[in-house]
Amino acid sequence: MQKKIKKRLKKENLLRIFSKTLAFLFLVLFISFFVFLLTEATKIGPDFAKSLFNLEFNLGNKQAGIWFPLLVSFIVSIGALIIASYIGVRTSFFLVYRCKPKIRKKLSLIIDILSGIPSVIFGLFASQILSIFFRDILKLPPLSLLNVIAMLSFMIIPIVISLTTNTLTYVNNDLISVVVSLGENKTSAIYKIIKKEIKPQLTVILTLAFARAISETMAVNFVLQSVNYQEVINNNRFFTSDLKTLGSVISTFIFSENGDEQINGVLYIFGIIILILVSLLNFFAIWSANPKTLERYPFLKKISNFIYQVVWFIPNNISALFVDLTSTRQSVKKIKVNNINERSLFFKERLQSVVWIKLNYFLKIFQELICTFLAFGFVLAILLFVFINGSVAINNNGSTVFSFEADSTGRALVNTLVIILITITITFPLALLIAIWLNEYNNSKVVKNVFNFVIDSLSSMPSIIYGLFGLSFFLRVLQLSAGGANGTSLIAGILTISVVILLFLIRTCQQALNNVSWDLRISAFALGISKREVIFKIVLPSALKGLIVALILSINRIIAETAPFFITSGLSSSNLFHLSLPGQTLTTRIYGQLFSINSNAISVMLETSLVSVVFLILLIFFSSYLIPSLFLLNKQKWLVIKSKFQSFKLWKRT
């Protein structure tokens, strides 16, 4: 008996110690992440270091002024945020308050598809379709900052819609009922009460969306080509220019022919600056999300209000215009004894005022419809663009979808599948064990908050920063490439994307474990069941659905990534297949055609885009419909299916 108890305790301690060790090794990994970035940044050289805070940018002349690239990044991101917030919030109001739950669920699936589309496909769409709109309809330069603002706005719209919709679902619906019972209509309740109620959350959503926009790299390179900042600004053609953002400067010069150690040091510093900016934005978002924090630190509330007022300046002023029209049109404000003769004018103007108010509410609903049409119309447009043109490209004689040579879409698909398989094999067990320790064993709120902050902050980092880490550590230090320190390899790409996916999987596994009712654990402990047995026999089986969905979403994330693979795995595949040799993925194959001189480069982009989008839609279908449907089948139904299957086998034998 004592031996059994000792064995049981040994197993219990083994899981706890092992998962805790992994969790703290995870922290060490990300400390080394920052150390390696800083180490590479110190190689900048004195000439470049002196020029960092100047206005001149010309890496060939050792001028690396950061202000103009940073200014372009900020202006483009703010422009995209203004458009995305206006369309996204109104679309969310339409989905939550105008649509039935079944319709909302189906429309939300379309938004999930938009959020899963790789950024390089957005870039391809902007360079091929949006450019025509700007050139032929607006009579503006086709490839410009205005094009990028439009593209980025639709890239961050899914973030705004999904987060705002989730926020609205938690708002008490009694607020609307109370306002309606006082004589106001539903639209008035939404915009006067609900919108104010979610104002702090909206600020957090806008901050996260801005961080996503400012960190975009690969899609921007499809449109922006110039680094002549001083010349463009002196000629007063900023918005119609094709000046590069800070992130796209990194991806442009990281493998340039004239690149040396000092230029790479400059690019690492640019990456660290983006890292700091995004970290501060995420820190503000996480910190200000807590109402108690806003009460304790009033300056946070002022910053939050400032962000809200800047982004909503135009919509709020349009609404204020209608309020002014409805309030100032009445010359007779109130009927009294001394103006009884003016009662007919009073009622006439009052009626006109009511008409203006109704028109205002009608316009709000109309705006919701237009915004919803724009959001879902863009999804339809990009899907039609990919499916129609991709199908034509696949049916051409030059299609390489079913070829597995070095420069083929089939080989890129195989490389992507290999990367997915190895990455998931590495990261999923590690992420699950770390999530188990954080959720089931750790009792310290401070430790849990530190881990959650690190995970949330690093999860939203620009993926090109991870690419720089992979370049400096896996290729330059460990030399995990057949070409040595200056080469690229599939294994370097796999390990780099594993770092990215590990963060995502830890968080999603944590959420899946949290969704399991704590009453089940308490009941099991009351029966004398050990914590290890509770985890493996109760918690994990109950969280299985969430864990499978997390796994599928992580595969989706791997397929959609470009920057980490572009820097570590290369833009082309080797003639031989080996993990130590270069290998392009589906997304890097699309991006690599930007630098190709082949006449069929666009066709290659289109056929690869079609393969990627079909793959992603299947994954989203599995995670949103198939997996939940399978788990809705109760045990009895599974037994019925099993008995029918056995009867069929018996019948087949006879």
UniProtKB/Swiss-Prot annotation:
Subcellular location: Cell membrane
Protein name from the UniProt record: Phosphate transport system permease protein PstA homolog
GO biological process: phosphate ion transmembrane transport
SUPFAM superfamilies membership: MetI-like
CDD domains in the cross-refs: TM_PBP2
Organism: Mycoplasma genitalium (strain ATCC 33530 / DSM 19775 / NCTC 10195 / G37)
Regions crossing the membrane: 22-42, 64-84, 113-133, 143-163, 266-286, 303-323, 368-388, 417-437, 453-473, 486-506, 535-555, 613-633
Keywords of this entry: Cell membrane, Membrane, Phosphate transport, Repeat, Transmembrane, Transmembrane helix, Transport
PANTHER family: PHOSPHATE TRANSPORT SYSTEM PERMEASE PROTEIN PST, PHOSPHATE TRANSPORT SYSTEM PERMEASE PROTEIN PSTC
Membrane topology qualifier: Multi-pass membrane protein
